[in-house]
């Protein structure tokens, strides 16, 4: 159960987790052909917060919107949303799906849901002051999913968007990238990306050899674009599609 006193706007955490404790993590992607405005209004709404804040076994939850096109547009993609969660174990996750009425309503109103179970093995940085990824794991051969998240400083917003547009285009055409989408909690300011790669090596080939990407990394550090950053690599344990 997540203590209410730790709720800070869109943050639902945190308790002390023993180092030996192993959590389960999921990324749910929801797609809408109808009910788009209903889902958009749910973003950051008190109704959603109240529905999930005291659910047993829940350690972390974020409901994220997405940007149109490649995800870096200031115009939202009203047809696509992402939810990231961590649980004490899969039994609590199953109970949430079976019993949480608001989550069930989201499923019913959506046209498709993709459930990805992940195993984080490399992570650095924080999300609202805390890193929710606690497992001690290692890379397994196969596809990986990468999450990057940053809070952009207000006085760096224009520079950020001008510079990142070229990188977004380059990653979409990069060999080894199966999927890429810009997501976020707060339009423009709190930015994140989710990408799926055929292997860890294919991700590294892009990250460490693509000139556009390297240029942006250097510029971000030099100009101090971000007040907070998080980078996570995860094994993909399973991926299921529900319609």
Language model: regions and residue ranges:
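A common structural junction motif
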Residues: 101-108, 214-215
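Extended hydrophobic/aromatic segments used for targeting, binding, or gating
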Residues: 205, 211-228
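Short S/T/G/P-rich N-terminal loop/turn motif that feeds into the first structured element of a domain
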Residues: 1-81, 90-96, 108-192, 202-209, ...
């Amino acid at each position: 159960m997540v203590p209410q006193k730790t709720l800070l706007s869109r943050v639902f955490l945190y308790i002390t987790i023993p180092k030996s404790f192993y959590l389960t993590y999921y990324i749910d992607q929801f797609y809408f052909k109808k009910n788009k405005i209903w889902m958009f209004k749910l973003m950051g709404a008190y109704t959603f917060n109240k529905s999930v804040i005291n659910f047993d076994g829940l350690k972390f939850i974020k409901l994220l919107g997405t940007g149109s096109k490649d995800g870096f547009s200031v115009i939202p993609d009203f047809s696509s949303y992402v939810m990231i969660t961590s649980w004490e174990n899969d039994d609590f996750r199953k109970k949430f799906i079976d019993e949480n009425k608001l989550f069930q309503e989201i499923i019913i109103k959506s046209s498709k849901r993709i459930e990805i179970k992940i195993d984080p093995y490399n992570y650095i940085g924080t999300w609202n002051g805390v890193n929710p990824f606690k497992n001690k794991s290692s890379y397994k051969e196969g596809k990986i999913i990468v999450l990057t998240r940053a809070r952009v400083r207000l006085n760096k917003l224009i520079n950020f968007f001008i510079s990142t547009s070229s990188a977004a285009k380059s990653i979409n055409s990069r060999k080894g990238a199966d999927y890429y989408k810009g997501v976020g909690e707060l339009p423009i300011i709190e930015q994140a990306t989710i990408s799926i790669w055929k292997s860890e090596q294919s991700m590294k080939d892009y990250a460490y050899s693509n000139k556009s990407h390297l240029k942006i990394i250097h510029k971000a550090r030099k100009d101090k674009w971000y007040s907070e950053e998080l980078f996570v690599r995860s094994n993909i344990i399973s991926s299921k599609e529900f319609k």
